[in-house]
């Protein structure tokens, strides 16, 4: 940090929620909060959201790809409050499950999340969110219904049969069904 001449930061070897707890009061919250654990980040969502200032950026990394891809659906339900399905777009479903869990926690705290950017690499998923300390966000939790017979898919609020071939559909969720990134933020990143 000295090489980059950054002085307004803090690190700790304390347990993460204990550390974030000391920054959860108004005036002490961070403008950028990064959660990058080994495995699932969900147990840190509550304290990380509380430690992020209004208008600040929360970045979250998940490395438990097997859970998010449905190899253990019960584990995914327990950790992310959602069910994945195996499809050709499983990576997107995994990201949406992470965002859905964040939305669930943020909603309980009356905080709005706005995804700015999401990414996937071979061994992790990462989401960058703007945090706003005001409720009133349009409900962004729902389900993705996928028909294995014909590949049809759509986001809904409840399970249905496929409207193309009337087959039984698989359902992933509840998960984030809103926008995955802010266009202006991504454009600025590219500059």
What role is predicted for each listed range?
Residues 1-191:
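SAM-dependent transferase fold signal centered on methyltransferase-like domains
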């Amino acid at each position: 940090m000295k090489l980059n001449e950054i002085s307004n930061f803090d690190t700790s070897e304390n347990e993460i929620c204990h550390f974030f707890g000391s920054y959860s009061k108004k005036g002490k919250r961070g403008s950028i909060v990064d959660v990058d654990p080994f495995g699932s980040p969900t147990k840190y969502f509550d304290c990380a959201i509380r430690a992020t200032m209004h208008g600040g950026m929360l970045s979250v990394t998940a490395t438990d790809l097997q859970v998010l891809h449905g190899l253990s659906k019960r584990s995914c339900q327990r950790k992310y409050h959602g069910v994945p399905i195996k499809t050709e777009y499983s990576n997107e479903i995994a990201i949406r499950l992470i965002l859905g869990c964040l939305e669930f926690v943020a909603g309980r705290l009356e905080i709005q999340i706005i995804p700015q950017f999401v990414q996937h690499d071979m061994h992790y998923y990462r989401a960058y969110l703007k945090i706003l300390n005001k409720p009133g966000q349009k409900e962004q939790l729902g389900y993705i219904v996928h028909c294995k017979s014909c590949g049809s898919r759509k986001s809904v609020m409840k399970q249905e049969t496929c409207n193309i071939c009337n087959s039984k559909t698989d359902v992933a969720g509840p998960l984030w069904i809103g926008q995955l990134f802010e266009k202006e933020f991504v454009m600025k990143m590219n500059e």
